[in-house]
Amino acid sequence: MHYIGIDIGSTAAKVSVFKEDELAFNFTMPTGWSSIETSKVIEKNLIEKGIDLEKSNIIATGYGRISVPYADKTITEITCHGRGTHYLLGKDATVIDIGGQDTKIITLENGRVTNFTMNDKCAAGTGRFLELMANTLGVAIDDLANMALEGEDINITSMCTVFAESEVISLIGSGTKKESIARGIINSITGRVYAIAHKHGIRGTVF
């Protein structure tokens, strides 16, 4: 029996396949413009890997979970975060999820989600913000963190993503090193997420 978890987020889709109690394989892919098309590609990939979907237990989550017609059940991301964290840690924890379109802070007590806070009103403090800033710098989003380690502290003061982009463009124009701008971007999103988490309250291990 295969147990398959499919998470179609706003920017990326993640798939994990367990055979009984062991992870068999996983893969990720961009969500693209259509979660329905992404779901079809995932289905094709699973079949090509020899997975019999009819004999598998499939759970879908994420923004595009309703686009997975071959799923046996759909579950919210918050519930999945709770169950997954309890499976991995087995103790009380605070989960911080910086997604493509929102940031979630989730409190987990005795294996159950007891509280959560979601910032979905503004792109600032989300993966979209990081993606936009990386594009503005002309670098891959995966390279931002390593670049930031080599930069000097500067402040990205704008709280709005559009204004922050303009601020980054101005910094580039003034000759500020990309590494320092990357550091400012990382510090900016870290500060925003910390403010949300501090207001929410931290319990146990931060995951």
Model-derived segments and spans:
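Gly/Thr-rich phosphate-binding beta-strand-loop-beta motif of the actin/hexokinase/Hsp70
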Residues: 1-20, 92-112
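Short glycine-rich, Thr/Ser-proximal phosphate-binding strand/loop in the N-terminal lobe
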Residues: 3-44, 115-122
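Short acidic, glycine/serine/threonine-rich loops at helix termini
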Residues: 16-18, 68-72, 105-111, 117-119, ...
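Short beta-strand-loop/turn "lid" adjacent to the catalytic site in phosphate-handling enzymes
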Residues: 19, 28-31, 49-79, 114-115
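Phosphate/pyrophosphate-binding loops at sites that engage ATP/ADP/AMP, CoA/4′-phosphopantetheine
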Residues: 43-56, 193-204
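Glycine-rich phosphate-binding loop plus the immediately following alpha-helix
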Residues: 110-153, 160
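Adenine-nucleotide phosphate-binding core of ATP-dependent small-molecule kinases
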Residues: 166-203
